Amino acid sequence: MGQVGFGQPDDGIIQMAYVVADLRAAIGQWIERLRVGPWFVLEHFTGEHPVYRGQPSGAAVKLAMGFAGHMNIELIQENNNAPSVYREVIERRGYGFHHFGVATWNFDAAVAQYEREGYALAFRAAVPSGGRVGYMDTTAVLPGFTELIELGGAFEEVFGRFYRASIAWDGKDAIRSFI
């Protein structure tokens, strides 16, 4: 097992994600209460070729990423009410923790392993960093989904840029563009 550029283990947890009702308000609380920042915001995300529970997905979200130490934090707000892994959690228990992000160099093998263990692939899509993500439904045994995040492509550049910005962040320029 190695490490990704921001210090977390590859094939380990690199991200904690939360669904929120109001992205800007949530960012404000993370900055004020937890001193996490800066935040990189993507106003509209659907993924490329998104599939939810075996069907094409029309779900759209806005999201923000920041770092607390070496851990990536993702905040997610729905842009619509389309069926999605986000809507599932909100309807089941409200806003709050949603998923663990786990890095993997071998995405297909990781998905297959989870499926062999009985966990369904609830959502999959290609992402702007050039990789793929897959949300495995681990909600029966963990407090949320497990998102498999494919390493490679522009992953290190994108996440590395966010991480480097968080080191000795002075509280200025708290909200920045994701792209």
Describe the predicted segments one by one.
Residues 12, 128-132:
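Short acidic/glycine-enriched loop/turn segments that link adjacent beta-strands
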Residues 46-50:
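Short, charge-patterned binding micro-sites
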Residues 44-45, 80, 128-129:
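Conserved beta-strand edge residues that scaffold enzyme active sites
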Residues 1-14, 18-41, 53-120, 137-179:
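Glyoxalase I/VOC metalloenzyme domain signal
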